[in-house]
Amino acid sequence: MDMDLNNRLTEDETLEQAYDIFLELAADNLDPADVLLFNLQFEERGGAELFDPAEDWLEHVDFDLNPDFFAEVVIGLADSEDGEINDVFARILLCREKDHKLCHIIWRE
C-alpha cells in the first residue's frame, strides 16, 4: 500500500468519519437496548476518542498499523461529561489516507 502523508484525514475528519460509520451500522451490530441507551445518553455522556491503533488489532488484520496512517476511534459513554469513555460501544480502526478507504470495527458484545 503506497500512502501519502500529505493526503491524510485530519484528526477531526477521522473522528467524524468514524462516528458517521458507527451511526450507520450500530442498529445492525448492537443490541437494540444498547442502541437506545447510547442515543439517550450520548448528548450528556457520549464521546469519540482518537488513539494510535492498539496492539490487539493485529489479531484482526494482517498489515502494518503505522500510526501515521491508521487510527483507532473509541465510541461510547463516560461517567461524566469530561470523563474518559469507560462504556465502549465500538472500536473503529480507520485508514487516514484519503485514497485508501479501510475500516474495521469491533462491536460491544
Swiss-Prot record:
It comes from the Bacteria. InterPro entries: dsDNA_mimic_put, Put_dsDNA_mimic_sf. Pfam families: DUF440. HAMAP family: Put_dsDNA_mimic. Belongs to the putative dsDNA mimic protein family. May act as a double-stranded DNA (dsDNA) mimic. Probably regulates the activity of a dsDNA-binding protein. This is Putative double-stranded DNA mimic protein YciU. It comes from Escherichia coli O45:K1 (strain S88 / ExPEC). The lineage of its organism: Bacteria, Pseudomonadati, Pseudomonadota, Gammaproteobacteria, Enterobacterales.
